[in-house]
Regions:
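Alpha-helical support elements that line or immediately flank enzyme active sites
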Residues: 1-7
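Conserved active-site segments centered on acidic
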Residues: 11
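A structural-propensity feature for long, helix-poor, extended segments
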Residues: 15-54, 58
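Non-catalytic surface loops within mature trypsin-like serine protease
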Residues: 20, 84, 166-168
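A conserved regulatory-domain signal marking ACT and ACT-like small-molecule sensing domains
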Residues: 27, 47-51, 65-68, 88-196
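Contiguous domain-boundary segments centered on the initiation and propagation of an alpha-helix
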Residues: 42-87
């Protein structure tokens, strides 16, 4: 479900790759169907999860599910590539840490580290001076308290990803303000208690 929230809608097309023990036991344990259900926005207690392949077809979502050896990845890893008309492609790599919890470890090829269990702002931006200050100022203006902030980048002056966990839900006005800033490529907000 974190992947769907990050993408902002259910994808029209998805490629799902299972690695390690997910590849070995995913179908037997229902991991494959649970991943498709999450992309469709189904909650963990949704009775349609065993039928998620059929539901995806009915909703017009094409997908492929394959096993893949992902070098250096955690044994319980899934890699998901999502596409939809008018939405930039998104590639997410995450692994299970047990008990229904996950850790997102790559976003569009950049190493990251977050769970989506807290209110989380994810900003993809050009790696240049002043971006972190702009984000902090916008959050301060909206009276949002930052719990943690991590910054990742592909290379100096390349693309960066800020992962900001907050104590409150971030209002749409603050998200809109951030999206309007030059150098900001994409802004996504994960509300663990919000809609998918």
């Amino acid at each position: 479900m974190v992947a769907r929230q990050l993408f902002g809608r259910h994808p029209e097309r998805a490629e799902v790759y299972l690695h390690g023990s997910f590849a070995a036991t995913g179908k037997g344990h229902g991991t494959d169907r649970a991943l498709i259900a999450g992309l469709l926005g189904m909650m963990p207690d949704d009775m349609r999860i065993p039928d998620s392949y059929e539901v995806a077809k009915d909703m017009g979502m094409d997908f492929v599910m394959k096993n893949k050896n992902i070098k250096g990845a955690h044994p319980n890893t899934a890699q998901i590539i999502m596409e939809a008309e008018g939405v930039p492609q998104m590639k997410i790599q995450a692994h299970s840490i047990g008990g229904g919890r996950i850790c997102v470890c790559k976003l569009d090829g950049i190493d990251v580290n977050f769970s989506g269990e807290s209110c989380t702002l994810i900003i993809r931006n050009v790696d240049e001076p002043g971006r972190i200050m702009e984000v902090a100022a916008a959050l301060s203006k909206a009276e949002i308290n930052v719990a943690t902030m991590q910054v990742f980048r592909d290379k100096r002056g390349g693309t960066a990803v800020m992962v900001v966990e907050t104590d409150q839900v971030i209002p749409q006005s603050a998200i809109d303000e951030l999206e309007s800033k030059p150098g900001i490529i994409r802004v996504k907000f994960l509300d663990p208690n919000g809609s998918v």
